[in-house]
């Protein structure tokens, strides 16, 4: 186990460990990879990482640009997986040890064995069975939430919080937005309370962040909602450039801002 920043003492520390100990499998978080994405790519080339067979990433949504970058850099399977502290093991992933399946960047995969994952309407509890319909990710019993059986010896609070938040049915709520495509791959869109209401349009921050992160000069981004007298809320993005030298002048910064806005408008619409 390595405990520390992926850039200390330098941005090659992960890869030096892989080379020294002939590491075959790694597990980390997407943020650590995004930190490395900002560094000089030559660090990865200084070490022999041929022993590495796969990289697992979890703990937060893995955006498609980051997944694509690390996949290209390592040329090994990048295995996203989605779970919660309460569940104790993955809800969504690709169990390639049982059945080989194609990775889709941006998706943690399909429901693990034993999990009956549903996409449901937050207002009615109706199950959304069509492809790419956005709803709350819920799970039928008895498997969830795994190791968690109550909340501070308050059984009623446990049931009301986790099992009765979706109207009209007893269903474990992950409190995450998600969609499922036509092939059964799930995409997690962020927390249900992490939503911006722009002129009556409910927008998930993760959707906006992933759109911005697709720009080649954006390494990291966070989106929050701020108050606006006209629209109620508007989205504000805080971004870290991959190459700050390209933003030395106000003209360059304005140009990047216009490019980012155009990217979001193209992918999500001008409302974002």
Regions from the language model: what does each represent?
Residues 51, 75, 114, 157, ...:
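Glycine-centered tight turns that cap/initiate beta-strands
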Residues 118-141, 182-183, 247-257:
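Conserved beta-loop-beta connector loops within the AMP-binding
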